[in-house]
Amino acid sequence: MKKLVSFLAVAACAAMLLTACGGREKKDISGAQSIADLKGATIGAQTGTFHLEALDQIDGVVKKDYPDFTDLLNALKSGAIDGYVAEEPTAFDVCSKDETLSFLPFVNNDTGFTATDAETGIAVAFKTGSDMVETVNAIIAEIPAETRSALMQQMVTLGADPDAAFNEELALSADASEVANGTLKVAMECAYAPFNWTQTTDANGAVAISGKDNLYANGYDVAVAKYIAARLGMKLEVYSYEWDSLIAAVQSGAVDAIAAGMSPTDEREEQVDFTDCYYNSNLVVIIKK
């Protein structure tokens, strides 16, 4: 009887410890061929994004949301989730930096999530009614699809070691010597590589983050923002905001625009005006090998 009681006590303690550590039954999804194969898995996505909404397309999935991609990555590594939704370029960036990670290469509207171009594309956001939308649309239209793709490939490579010299001319650039038309204040997270990230030097064309000493922003969004500002004859200033504060920043006039890997969803279009998309991507799921 004493042995039974002791065994039960040990089992109870083990269960308590498992619960305290966020223990759960993990699901191996490494062989998933489509999102239907994720049934029963615990999948994360960033709060307030289409990624999170898209998880409702999977029957029986356990959905978890986190404030940013650093939290998602930490949750995956700790075992709190089996995977998390990201754009394909983000997956390439993350997995290139950590050989323990991989991703499920789903294709939108095929093996992957059902989504429109607006839901999986990224665009620049302006305050509702801004006449800048039409102007910037004309600039975006000048950028060929091949250039957009080449720039993203460069940013994935550059993001692996942001402060090291990148001895290659970027696919997208413009003369920024003329800034007679004022300042273009652009907000982004500066924490969503390869779209935008923070580094400690101005290497490879990084832009100083306003209000942050010795911190610089770089990435795909930064390159596009630099191009737009140069074509407008404006000086570019980059501001770092938490994701949930980006729209409020442009609504209040604290910044002029958002370039933050943000998709022009119906909900967001009720709050701000978007340009045409300057990049489109498949949604994939990052996992541990």
Question: What function would you assign to each model-found segment?
Answer:
Residues 26-35, 155-182:
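Bacterial Sec-exported substrate-binding components of ABC uptake systems
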Residues 37, 42-45, 51, 56-78, ...:
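Extracytoplasmic small-molecule ligand-binding "clamshell" domains
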Residues 16-20:
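C-terminal motif of bacterial Sec signal peptides marking the signal peptidase cleavage site
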Residues 21-22, 63-65, 103, 175-176, ...:
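Conserved beta-strand scaffold positions in the cores of enzyme catalytic domains, especially
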Residues 1-7:
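Positively charged n-region of N-terminal signal peptides that target proteins for export
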Residues 22, 47-49, 115-165, 222-231, ...:
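Extended ligand-binding regions for polar small-molecule ligands
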Residues 11-15:
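Alpha-helical transmembrane segments
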Residues 25-38, 88-119, 230, 235-289:
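Acidic, polar ligand-binding/catalytic clefts
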